[in-house]
Amino acid sequence: MADLSVRRGTGSTPQRTREWDPFQQMQELMNWDPFELANHPWFANRQGPPAFVPAFEVRETKEAYIFKADLPGVDEKDIEVTLTGDRVSVSGKREREKREESERFYAYERSFGSFSRAFTLPEGVDGDNVRADLKNGVLTLTLPKRPEVQPKRIQVASSGTEQKEHIKA
């Protein structure tokens, strides 16, 4: 990109202007986020605090897939975990605390409401042994992997002869 020195006005200090670069403009347009203004306080929802959406940590060990979510203030009776095929879903709600009309808040940034998250799992989850534990506001899902399936060798018999011998792996 070339810079041009252009003398403007009556002063003696030259001002620099940029030559138009279509590639630079294309890069700026690619980096532009049309929803950026939605996060501006002017457009914010003034009805109340944002919705409660817990963040998850998902990791894999040799034996299982481990999901962890911070759910402070959520009671275990308000959490539902379902496993359907290759999909695990976690949903629940965090209730708003009752407020007295005489109370005056200077800040109210806590979030409440219902949430639902779903994750697609790789093959091999042992759905019969899934565990869900809530301790100190942290939900831990343990989805164990099925034992590796060992291949079974099948003897190929020639046509017209009976297969009498079974070979075990």
Swiss-Prot record:
Superkingdom field: Bacteria
A Pfam entry, by short name: HSP20
Keywords associated with the record: Sporulation, Stress response
A Gene Ontology biological process term: sporulation resulting in formation of a cellular spore
The keyword Ribosomal protein is annotated on this UniProt entry: no
Gene3D superfamilies the record matches: 2.60.40.790
Residue ranges constituting the sHSP domain according to the UniProt record: 47-159
Region (Disordered): 1-21, 150-169
Annotated InterPro entries: A-crystallin/Hsp20_dom, HSP20-like_chaperone, Small_HSP
Induction: By stress, such as heat shock and oxygen limitation.
Protein family (similarity comment): Belongs to the small heat shock protein (HSP20) family.
Role description: May stabilize cellular components during stress and spore formation.
UniProt-recorded name of the protein: Spore protein SP21
Organism annotation: Stigmatella aurantiaca (strain DW4/3-1)
This protein's encoding gene: hspA
